[in-house]
């Protein structure tokens, strides 16, 4: 590798709003504040929910289904 052309690769801490602290390496050069992480994101905690806005799926299926196909 050439000398003097690569950015500094330093250890930083990424702090989540839930209080989780993650130590990692980055070229950013300063600590990061995160909104969500793997400990508090709904997908990873199992609290994710599927929202069907006003029966849109049923409305679509009713409109574009082929009569007599069921």
From Swiss-Prot:
Binds 1 zinc ion per subunit. Zn(2+) binds at residues 16, 18, 37, 40. The keyword Transport does not apply. It comes from the Bacteria. Disulfide bonds: none annotated. Its cofactor is Zn(2+). The keyword Magnesium does not apply. Pfam families: Ribosomal_L31 (PF01197). GO terms for molecular function: metal ion binding; rRNA binding; structural constituent of ribosome. SUPFAM superfamilies: L28p-like (SSF143800). One of its GO terms (cellular component) is ribonucleoprotein complex. GO terms for biological process: translation. Keywords: Metal-binding, Ribonucleoprotein, Ribosomal protein, RNA-binding, rRNA-binding, Zinc. Belongs to the bacterial ribosomal protein bL31 family. Type A subfamily. Binds the 23S rRNA. Part of the 50S ribosomal subunit. This is Large ribosomal subunit protein bL31. The gene is rpmE.
